[in-house]
């Protein structure tokens, strides 16, 4: 479960969702110490931030090694992002596909802003490794999730901070089924069950409906991707 090859600290973008929880486990297997950062940007699914605390408690319960490695959990509030965005994640509007081929859940610049804030915090704390759950395999087409975007931002951050920043994206080329499998490989059934029960993906913040893959409305793009991945993972496809 654990690789002690690194004596460094990593900062994980940890929203409380499936992908970021899996990335947290990935980081705990590779770094000597791991801190987490989450963002309150006025999202409709603010419930995800409440899930973070339960997930962190769950990680500590799964492994004493993980418990020892987990460091500070940071939460930053960025209200301006909702003020300048007109999307289904920050407004009470129906989720729909836009004329540009992107769903209206796309929050322009969100990951760019998150990674800039994460890098600024990491700089203050002497951290040069940042881990995020961006992926361009099973995703909604968001341009700020693409590998070329992340690589360009890594270069910009390294230049702007005058130190070598590494942006790790362990899910970039994994589909959702492979993401479930990665959780299994890293933490066994205990981690898979924790992610099913206590992570949150649904864009609408629905926690009343329980499915095999966890909680959610079952209809939004995030729920559909998570459900499809679970079915493929569980059936061994």
From Swiss-Prot:
Q: Where does ATP bind?
A: 14-24
Query: Its GO biological process terms?
Result: queuosine biosynthetic process
The domain of life for this entry's organism is Bacteria
Q: Which cofactor does it need?
A: Zn(2+)
Offer one Pfam family short name for this entry. QueC
Q: Which GO terms describe its molecular function?
A: ATP binding; ligase activity, forming carbon-nitrogen bonds; zinc ion binding
Q: How is the cofactor bound?
A: Binds 1 zinc ion per subunit.
Catalytic function, reaction form: 7-carboxy-7-deazaguanine + NH4(+) + ATP = 7-cyano-7-deazaguanine + ADP + phosphate + H2O + H(+)
Broad enzyme group:
ligase
EC number(s) stated in the UniProt entry for this protein: 6.3.4.20
- Keywords from the named record: ATP-binding, Ligase, Metal-binding, Nucleotide-binding, Queuosine biosynthesis, Zinc
| SUPFAM superfamilies xrefs | Adenine nucleotide alpha hydrolases-like
**Record CDD domains:** QueC-like (cd01995)
Pathway given for this chain reads: Purine metabolism; 7-cyano-7-deazaguanine biosynthesis
Per UniProt, Zn(2+) binds at: 202, 217, 220, 223
Write down the NCBIfam families for this protein, in alphabetical order: 7-cyano-7-deazaguanine synthase QueC
**Function of the molecule:** Catalyzes the ATP-dependent conversion of 7-carboxy-7-deazaguanine (CDG) to 7-cyano-7-deazaguanine (preQ(0)).
HAMAP family xref list: QueC
Q: What family is reported?
A: Belongs to the QueC family.
Name listed for the protein in its UniProt record? 7-cyano-7-deazaguanine synthase
- What species does this protein belong to? Rhodopseudomonas palustris (strain TIE-1)
Q: What gene codes for this chain?
A: queC
């Amino acid at each position: 479960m654990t690789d002690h090859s690194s004596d460094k600290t990593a900062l994980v973008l940890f929203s409380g969702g499936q992908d970021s929880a899996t990335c947290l486990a990935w980081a705990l297997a590779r770094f000597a110490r791991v801190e987490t950062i989450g963002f309150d940007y006025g999202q409709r699914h603010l419930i995800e931030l409440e899930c973070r605390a339960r997930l962190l408690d769950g990680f500590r319960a799964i492994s004493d090694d993980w418990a020892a490695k987990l460091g500070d959990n940071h939460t930053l509030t960025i209200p301006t992002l909702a003020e300048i965005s007109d999307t289904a994640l920050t407004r009470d509007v129906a989720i729909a596909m836009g004329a540009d081929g992107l769903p209206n859940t796309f929050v322009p610049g969100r990951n760019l802003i998150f990674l800039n804030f994460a890098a600024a915090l990491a700089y203050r704390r002497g951290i040069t490794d940042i881990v995020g759950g961006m992926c361009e395999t099973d995703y909604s087409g968001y341009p700020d999730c693409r590998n070329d975007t992340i690589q360009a931002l890594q270069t910009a951050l390294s230049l702007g901070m005058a130190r070598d920043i590494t942006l790790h994206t362990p899910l970039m080329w994994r589909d959702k089924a492979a993401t479930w499998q990665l959780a299994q490989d890293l933490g066994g059934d205990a981690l898979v069950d924790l992610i099913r029960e206590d992570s949150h993906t649904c864009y609408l913040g629905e926690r009343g409906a329980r499915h095999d893959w966890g909680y959610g409305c079952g209809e939004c793009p995030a729920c559909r991707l998570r459900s499809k991945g679970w079915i493929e993972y569980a059936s061994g496809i």
